[in-house]
Each structure stands twice: as structure tokens, then as C-alpha cells.
Amino acid sequence: MLTSHSFPPLVIRGRSLLPIVQGGMGVGISAHRLAGSVAREGALGTIASIDLRHHHPDLLERCAQSPDRATLEQANLTALAREIHAAKALSEGRGMIAVNVMKAVSAQADYVRVACESGAHAIVMGAGLPLDLPDMTQGHDIALIPILSDSRGVALVLKKWMKKGRLPDAVVIEHPAHAGGHLGVTHLADMHDRRFDFVRVLEELETVFTSLGLKRDDVPLIVAGGINSHEAVRELLDAGANGVQLGTPFAVTEEGDAHPNFKRVLAEAAPEDIVEFVSVTGLPARAVKTPWLVRYLRQETKIREKVGALKHACPTALQCLSVCGWRDGIEKFGHFCIDTRLAAALRGDVANGLFFRGREALPFGSAIRSVHDLIELLLTGATRPSVAGRWAFFLG
């Protein structure tokens, strides 16, 4: 556990943490081993709630014997409870264990309920405006952390939640031009809009807080997307952020829950290997151009023209998304089974998987290092390697 660094702590619901947050990554990329290891260092580790049954052979066997929606959903809820308990045990009482729940997921309320009942310390929710999250967690002592991308979204959530007598315990501000996975914009062309620049959002939120009668320290602000160095952390905290969130750099650590092939694909990707596209959720997304994705994007226009408006049966029977371009026949959305592709990536199936990744270089280049090494590098600059051709992060 790192004890010597120069940054103030990130305080969330009375817990004093290192100002480092590990982002939630599904399917199964951030499960108990990664989240628990991050928390054991004194930071905030996050379990991605979606489809965790893939880490549990007995649950997969049960689903194979009864491949219906009810069985699959119950298996995933059981897996989530197991992962939370395992992460808390691994953390040895340090740090904080959060559960990430996507607003776009059909079973969001059940995931939130199980997270609360299983002793998670926080719920993190993105992929949509989590306006009803305080209602879903009524009666539970749990931190609530929405993920948003601009000051307008933060202001809306603050106003709605304040009417319910609740403030967010922190807010993650994710920059769509840098982050991996699903991005907080409506259209691909919007991701580089200046309204998402970290400094601008932090400055605008000073005004928002004042207008709502809030003090700046009432709600910690955590910035996310492209952060890959001690210098970037210092610059962002000096600019007014209370913490930083990273996803891809944690996914490729030794403790990351994915197959080694998954880590190699992310760690060895060059800038030209990373692509943005429209997911089946309708949201823009960022991933590595692996063989399946290259084929899909090459045929995307033809797929939309031929079957884009046709509804299809869910290939897994899980019905994981509340709105799905493939299942619901929404022509402008993506047209593939995202659960199948993400599960393939988790297993290390390079040919068939969908490998979400952030845009920027990784702190250790293509090297696979430990969670401790990553946090130490981010907070102190120690053990920083000399990586030829490493791309720099510039604060926007």
C-alpha cells in the first residue's frame, strides 16, 4: 500500500482514499481480483456488474443446462454477489469497492439491489442519466457516483437529486475523446467538442455549484479519460479535480481479470489500431481493430441496408440491453451481439472478440505491470520507464 505521495486524499462518504479510481470494465474485465487489488492499495476499485457469470464455471454450466433468460439473469446476480464478497475480502478492509451499473442495461435495478445487499461501498452509473439512482438505493448507506461528460449533464443530475434530498457522493467527468468503451456523446462527431475539455468543465461547475448554493467541496469531482502519467495526474488535480479515473491502464495489469491475450491486444495496440464506431446501444464506442471488428466495420453499411430495420431474436436469451440495435431493428445503431463479442474478448479470443480500449498510450507502454506499480507511478512518478515513442497526454 502506497503511503508517501504529495496529493490530498479523495474523500468519498467519509472514506479517505488515494486520488485514484479504477474504472468499471465489462464483460468481466474488472471483477473481484482487479477491484480488490486496487482497493487494497487504498484506492477505489470498481467491479463491472454486467454478465459476471463468465468467471464462474458452475454458473456457466447451469446456464448451459437451462439457457433461458431467468436462469441467465439469476446467474449474473449470483456472480455479482460472489464478486463483491471476494473483492472485499481481498481488499483487507482498505480502500473502497464500487459496482458499475450501466443505465442502458435492462437489469439495472436488480444489479443495484444486489450491490447494496452484498455490501458494496458505492454504485457508479453511466451510459445514460442516472436520475432515479437515489430512488433505487433508498434505505441503503451506499455512495452514489454518476458518470457524466459535461457541466450541463452534471447540473441536471444535481438539480434532480437535490429535489430528492440527495447529493452525489462524487461525480466522474469522462472525456469522450480519450476514454474507451461506450462514450458519453450522442454522435461520433461530438466527441472532440470543446465542452468536454476538463478545465472548462471544472470551471463551469464552479459556477453551477454556486448557483445551486453548494460549496465546491460538497461533491468531489473525478476526471476520466486518457490519463497515463504522474504529470497528467498532477496537472488535473492542480486544475481542481479531486481524483482521476483510469480504465485501460488497470485492465492490462497483472491483477486484471481478463485473459492474458486480452491484455496483450490492448497493450500492443498502436494509435492506428484504435477506432471509434456506433455500438448496439446507439452510443459511440472506442475499441481495438481486431479481426472481427475490422470485418464488421467493412460490412456495416451493407448490414444496415439489408437487415438494419429487422428485429432479431436475442442470440443469448439474456436481453441484456434495454435498447439493442440488433434485437430491436434500429437501423442507425450497431448490429451485432455485444455480450457475445465482449465475452469472447474476456476469454482472449482475439479473432472474434470486441476489445474496448482508451485512445491514449499506456503508462508502461506494452509492459504488463502490477496494480501497485501503476498507482505508484501515477502518484509519485517512481519506476517510470523510458518508453520510446510514448504518446503524451495534454490537458484540454
Question: Residue ranges of each PLM-predicted region?
Answer:
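Residue-level detector of alpha-helix initiation sites
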Residues: 29, 227-228
